[in-house]
Amino acid sequence: MKGWFGLNTTAMTERVLIVLHQEQSTPGRVGYSLRQRGYELDIRRPRFGDPLPKTMADHAGAVIFGGPQSANDPDDFIKAEIDWIGVPLRDQKPYLGICLGAQMLARHMGQRVFTHPEGKAEVGYYPVRPTAAGRAICDWPDHQYQWHREGFDLPNGCELIAEGDIFQTQAFRAGTGYAIQFHPEVTHAMMCRWTTRGAGRMELPGTKQRHEHFADRPVYDHGIRAWLAEFLDHWLALGQRQLAAAE
């Protein structure tokens, strides 16, 4: 596999669709990593009226990020995004759902999204354990950064690739689609913003306090960076294999 700065020259003109849910949101480390691999980011915000493509012919993959919304919200753009996930799955292009985007994939696959029965949330660094299928993809760090109070069960026909303690299903695969409940995209600047603007979330049961986030970051972030690099190489290769098979 390519290293952190490995560039795929065949991807120099390819685009990855990036779906964000707030005006000031960024794709963080995921966006940086994709650019380092030669991909152009096509950033869209359906919440503010940006359309989503009817096919993936002009995109190498798609990433739907998180946000303060719930996959259970009645907003039209939430329902539209959940339905739209069928486009990359149909076209056999890589799809990655992060947090809200993962919950949307679970909903698309017919699974429910729910709050913890004891009102617990995961905000901070938490243990995540890969399954045998997850270990076959890449090496995993001991912890991942989390920021959510809803979770999901494994949809029928999907493959569990990571699990946790508070919310058991942490990551799964559905064809060329991946759902991850955690946030490998978070940079130090993003953590500063989230823990300031979202301070109220750290009052929920089970969450880590702000000082713990910053104390844990130097302990776990190196492993998360390495995981993201290896995972993205695997994820992008899904689309390249489909393209080679079609030719």
What role is predicted for each listed range?
Residues 1-11:
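N-terminal amphipathic/basic-hydrophobic helices that include classical n-h-c signal peptides
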Residues 12-17:
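Extreme N-terminal starter segment of soluble prokaryotic enzymes
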Residues 19-21, 46, 100:
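Cofactor-binding loop segments of dinucleotide-utilizing enzymes, especially the Rossmann-like FAD-
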Residues 24-29:
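Short N-terminal binding/cap micro-motifs at the start of the first secondary-structure element
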Residues 32-96:
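Flexible gly/pro-rich beta->alpha loop and the following alpha-helix that scaffold active-site loops
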Residues 88-112:
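Catalytic nucleophile loop
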Residues 109-189:
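Pocket-forming structural segment of enzyme catalytic cores
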Residues 186-247:
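Acyltransferase
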